[in-house]
């Protein structure tokens, strides 16, 4: 699926399914629970990450708009992290 969003406050959340994401446009940061945005590198076009289901994480778009391709192993959902 293609997803686009602009800058917004990051929220720690979880998904049921694993996913793989490729940044197509813009610059982002992605981090796991226990880290902060300051702990991780900026991810630009071509950057990739694998996110295990059930693992709390957050991400933020640092550009006017970010576009990503996401491949899910199952149902697409999102819930606030415990």
Model-derived segments and spans:
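Short histidine-centered beta-strand/loop micro-motifs
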Residues: 1-2, 10-15, 32, 40, ...
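Short acidic-glycine-tyrosine-enriched beta hairpin
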Residues: 5, 33-55, 62
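Glycine- and acidic-residue-biased ligand/ion/polar-headgroup-sensing regions
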Residues: 6-8, 15-35
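Solvent-exposed coil/turn segments that connect beta secondary-structure elements
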Residues: 8, 27, 54, 73-75
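A short local loop/turn or secondary-structure capping micro-motif enriched for an aromatic residue
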Residues: 9-10, 20, 38-39, 59, ...
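Structural recognition of the beta-strand scaffold that forms the well-ordered cores
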Residues: 21-22, 48-51, 60, 67-70
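Double-stranded beta-helix
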Residues: 58-82
